[in-house]
Amino acid sequence: MANFLQDVNCETVSEYDGPDASIPEGVWEGYVGHDHAALWRTWSYIYECCKKGTLVQFRGGKLVTFSMFDNPRFSNGAGIDAQKVLDLEDRARELQGYGPVNRRTDVMPVDRWTLNGPLLRYDKMVLEDVGGTGSNRTMVRAQLEALQDERDVPDCDFILNVRDYPLLRRDGTRPYPQVYGKGRRLPEPWARGGPHVPVVSMCSGPTYADIAVPTYECIAHAYTSSGRTLPAGGRFVKTPSADSLPAWRDRKALAVFRGSSTGAGTSTEDNQRLRALQISMSRPDLADVGITKWNLRPRKTERYDGYRIIEPWQFGRKSPYPAAAKPMTPEQIAGYKYVLCLWGHAPAFRLARDLSLGSVVLLPSRPPGQEGLDMWHSSVLKPWTHYIPVRGDLSDLEKRIEWCRDNDAECEKIAAAGMEASLNLLGWEGQLDRWMDVLRSVRLECCPGGYDMPPSPSLVSDSMCVRQMVSFPRYEDIPQPSSPMPVLPRCSGTLRGWGLAASLGWDLGDAAEVLNVKRSTAVLSKTVFNNLIYRTPHLRYTFGVAASDPESTAAVILSEKLKGAVTMRSWLEDSRAWARGRNVASVLCQVSQALLEAQAAAGTVFGDLSLDTILVVPNPLPEYIYHDGTGGSFGLKLMPGDKWAVVTYGDYTRARIRVLKGDGRKGHLAVVGPQPVYTKLSERKWHDICCLVSCILRTARTSKRPAARALAAAVARAAGVKRPDMDAEALEATPYEAREEPLTRFGPAEFINGLVREFKLEEGGWAWTEKNKNIEKVLRPWERGLPLYPVRLWLSGDRKEAMRACVSSVLKAAPPRPATAAGAHHTFQTYLRTVGADLDSFPEWAAAAAHLKRLWKSPGSLPAGSASLRAPSVPPPCHGPAWALPFGTRTPGEFPSWFDPSCLGDWTEAMGQGAPLDLENGPAKAGSDPVAVHSAWETASQLSFEEDGWTESEPRPVRREAHVRAKERH
C-alpha cells in the first residue's frame, strides 16, 4: 500500500498573498475550505475508488512532494460480467489469429480489473511505471519543476491525474458512467461528502470537478517547439520546427489521420476513427486515413448495455479488419493541408502539435455515446479562427473538406492562426500561465488564509528512532580474547552475552553477519524483538545496531547467523518439502507462536510476512512448549530431521515502543516503522496471517509440484479461508494488502488450532494442549542463560570461574521489584527463570539462588494495579489515520497521571498466562485483539503528542558501533 503518511509534507500552507486570478470554467465549490483532512479524503478516494494518482505539494515556492500512488489491490465494485467480457476477448483474439485467454493463470479476479473510461483491463500487468503512465508523469513533473524556477508558485496541495478520464464528479457519484451507470453513489465514507483538495486532470467536463491542465502531449509540444530538451524518461513525438515545414502550396489537398483504433465506440456510427476510415475508403480523393494498430479490447459507451468489441467485417469481406497502416511522422502529416484531430477514449491530446504543423485542423465535437469532455485550452481556441469544427458523428466531414478546397485562402489563414496559437497561447509560456491561474485561483477562492498541518507521524517516528538509537549502551573497545569463541546452546542468555561481546568490539566470526536495514527495523530489532527471545526462540536476534549517518533512515546491524538456515521458499522448492505436510504445519505453528508474543508485547505487524522472511533451520529441539493464550500450554514434537523456524524482519515491520523519557517528559508510545494509513484494516491480529497464507497460495499456484496446491489448500483451510477466496488470492499479482474484508479473520491462536486440526497433529502425537498446565511451571531451554556468562567464559576459558563472576555480579544488583501483578509477570521470566534456572543447576550456588528468590515478590502477593488502566477518550475512529482528523476533534483528553506506556505491554503480555488480572474490565479483554489494543493506545498518544515538547536543543551524536568496526575488519 502506498504510504501516504510517509509521503505527505506537513509544513503549514501559508496565507495567500499573490495577485488576483481566475479560470474561465470557475472553481468548484467543493474545493472551498479544504485543509489537511480534505487532503486525506481526496487521496484516499483516488486510491480506493480510482486506483492511482500523484500527490503534489508546493511549499515556499518549491515542489516538495511529487509522489505517485497505485493501489495494487484496487477493487472496482462495478459488478462486471467477467464471463461475457472474456468471451468477447477470446473472439477478438481469434479474429487476430491468437488463442484464447488462459483464464486460470492470466486473468485477475473480476473485482480487481482496472478501469479507464470505456475500457477495462483484466490481466496482471496493472502496476504501471515508466512503461505505462510513468513517462506521462515524468513530463508533468518536469514542467512543475520548471514552474518553480520561473514563477512564484503559492503553497498548495493537489492530486494529479494523468490518465485519459477525469475522476471527481460534482454530484458525489462514481466516475466512468459507461461502466457504473449514471447516478451510482460513491461508497462510504466518501459518499458523506466534505471538502476536497483540487484534482487536476488532462481533461474535464461540466459534470466533473477536475481542473484541466496541460496534457503530457501538450508539454512535449511546449518543450520541443521552444527549443528545450525533452526530459529523460519521456517517449513523446517532437514538434518539428517551422522552418522544416512545407509551404502551403506544396501540401496535398487531403484530410489526413494516423492512429490506433481507440475510442469508446465499436462501429462507424459511434467511433470517429472508424467512421473516418470508412469515408477515406469510399472517398480517397478527400481523405487519407489509416489505422496503425487495431485495439480490440472490450469497451462500453452509454448508448448500449454491456461491453462490445469493434465489429468485424465493417469495411469489406476480405478480412475482419483492414490491414494496419504505417505510422506517419509529424513532418509527413505536415505534407497535407487538412489534419483530422479525432477523439479516442477522450479528446485528442495531440491537438497542440497538430495545430503547429501549419495545416488546418478539422476538430470534431464529442462522438455519440461519449461524455462531453473539455481540454485546458477549450476556452482559448475559437472555431473558424483557429480550427474548423466538425460534428461528432462526422456527418458533415465530407462537406467540410470540400469547403476547405473551395476556400483555400481562408483555410490558409485559419491554419496560420492555429499555428500561432499553438506556439504562443498553447506554448511554453501559455502553459505556465495556465498552471499559475489554476493554482492562484484555487488558493484565492478556496483557502486564502492557508491551513496548518498536524505533525507527521512518520517524522515523529523517525525522531523517536534517533532517540532510541543514541540511547543504546556504548562501550570502549576491549582486546578480544585469543581463544576461539566458545560453543554454547542458543538461548536468551547466550544471545544477550554475544551481544555484549559484540559491543566490546569482539568479532563473532561466522555466528553473525552485517546487514543494511532501515533505521526503524534496526530499532525494533534491538528494543522489541531482542527482549522477546526469552519468550520465544523463533525471532532473529540482533547483536548490535549503528547508524551510518544521523540524517539517513538507513542503519547497519550485526545480526545472528543461523547455521544451515534457508528461506522457507527455498526449502519448499525442494522436490520433497511440499509433501512434508506435518513439518510445514509445525513450522507455521512456530511462526504463529512468535506472532502471538510479538503482538502482545508491542502490537507488532510484520507487514510483509512471507516465505522469504521466514528462515527454516536444521537440528530442532525435541519439543517446543508455549503458552496457548488462555492460561494453558501448547507443545510441539519434532524429529531430528525436521526444520524449526525463525522469523526475520523486513522494511515493512512496525510495532509500538515506549520512547525514552528525557528532560522531565513522560514516555511516549509511538509506532516505529511504516505508518498504517488504514488502522482499522492493517492493525489487526490477522493481517500477518493473511500475508503468509496469501504468499503460500500464490507460490503453490506457480509450483510444478503436485503436492503444492493440496498443501496450500490445507493451510488456507486451517486459516479459515473460503474456497472462492483461495482461488482468487492465488491469482493475485501482488503481495497481500489490507482490505475491508480480509482473506481471513483468524489470528495466530486460531491459525494454530486450525493447523492442528487440518494436519491431525494431536492425533499423531506431534502436538498437544494442556489447558490446566500454566507455562510458568515449564522450564524451556531458550529461557536459560546469564548474559555475562559467555563473555566471562570466553575471557577465562573456565566454566566455574565464569559462573563465579556472574553470580558475584548478580548478587551486587537486587532483582527488579515490580509494584503490580502485571509488572511482575512482565519481569518473571526475564529474571527469575533465566538467573534461577542456571543457578539451580549448580548445587554450590543454591544459597545464592535462594537469596535472589527471597528478594523477588510473587505475583499473587501484589495488587492487580494496572488492571484499572483505562484508555483516554478517543474520538470515533475515522476511515484512515488519526492524522486526518480535523483539528477540532483531535484532542483525546488528558492521559491519567499515572500512565506509563510500558504498562500496556506488561498488561497484554500477561494476558492468558495465569496473571491475577481483571481480564473482563481491563484495557484488553481476554481473547481480544492485542494489535488493535496497542493501536488504540497509540492513536490516543499520537493525538496528545506535543511536538515542541520533544524538540532537542542539541542533536545527539550517533557514533559508529565497535561491533560493526570489528566485523568490517574481519
Swiss-Prot record:
It holds the Pfam family Glyco_transf_90. The keyword Transferase applies. Keywords: Kinase, Transferase. Residues 942-970 are annotated as: Disordered. SMART domains: CAP10. Residues 953-970 have a biased composition (Basic and acidic residues). This is Uncharacterized protein 027R.
